[in-house]
Amino acid sequence: MSKLAVVAAGGTGGHMFPAQALAEALAARGWRVVLATDDRGALYADKFPAEERLALSAATAKSNDPLGMIKAGFVVLQGVMEARAAFKRLDPAVVVGFGGYPALPALLGALSQGRPTVIHEQNAVLGRVNRFLAPRVNEVACAFPILEKATPAVKACAHVVGNPVRPPVRALFDVPYLAPEVQLRVLVTGGSQGARLLSELIPEAVAKLPEEMRGRLKVFQQARAESMEQARKVYRNAMVECEVAPFFRDMAGYLRQSHLVIGRSGASTCTELAVAGRPSILIPLKIAADDHQRFNARLLEEAGGAAVCLEDELTVDVMAAALKALLSKPERLEKMAAGARSAAKPNAAEELADLVEKTAR
């Protein structure tokens, strides 16, 4: 019988999409895959190639909430016991965690049974759960050449494999960027959770662009449900063609069409922009844990692939000026596209799968 890997991820698309890409790579090599996730992660798992899903108890709490931390500890302990029972039945050859509190019970359960373990950090800053697990697991993989908040020992042994992306996005690495000639296509994405700031600010900024530029624009706007109608109204009044939706499932298709992307700088967003070779304006989420989105954005900015606007400095006028400066210079967009692609690691899923196979028993 083929070997089985448990992939533990959940919480957001930022954890789930790389986990799915690894699962697909392992499945293509003949592995069986079981997904350990939570209710939120299940929302992104409709195409996850898993023969079974484990819903393990998991919880988190703020460090300044002692009672909440105690309660969360008991919930995690319950999840660990659930994981141990499931692993005794499944006997996985390896357990792979993608960070976030939903992955913790599975990894602790595996460690308590002496099973091979691998963790992957998607961001340029080692997350809290992975920070705890890193000294204890067999192998640490990471997406970026910098890994803030990691100890020197962890940094020294970490494998820089990149962030796994799904095959449709990986295919864009081989598609050349075509600078705009007539129509200007802009994709606005707030990440898998949407972004109120972008839902409301970007349409207003677009409305301030010169009439000639607005007449050439087509905007694909991801917006929160409560902001969609207002966004459509602003675009309509500005005579801008638009497509507004709460979530774009075919992200590869929209990336392929777009000349410029505006979005947050979560790990998946930055990785997909690099692999697709798309220029971008990035707005790091100010409240992101350990300011990890700013570190993610910096890597694309230093490669020449992105312009970065900090939330505290962002206004409608600032965004309008940034849009005008980029959309009026196709040659600059082409140069940024090349810069973004220079930061890509398109074979991350295969490299991580190699590491997982090497670690498995």
From Swiss-Prot:
One of its GO terms (cellular component) is plasma membrane. Cell wall formation. Catalyzes the transfer of a GlcNAc subunit on undecaprenyl-pyrophosphoryl-MurNAc-pentapeptide (lipid intermediate I) to form undecaprenyl-pyrophosphoryl-MurNAc-(pentapeptide)GlcNAc (lipid intermediate II). Pathway: Cell wall biogenesis; peptidoglycan biosynthesis. CDD domains: GT28_MurG (cd03785). It holds the Pfam family Glyco_tran_28_C. GO terms for biological process: carbohydrate metabolic process; cell division; cell wall organization; lipid glycosylation; peptidoglycan biosynthetic process; regulation of cell shape. It comes from the Bacteria. Coiled coil: none annotated. Belongs to the glycosyltransferase 28 family. MurG subfamily. This is UDP-N-acetylglucosamine--N-acetylmuramyl-(pentapeptide) pyrophosphoryl-undecaprenol N-acetylglucosamine transferase. Its EC number is 2.4.1.227.
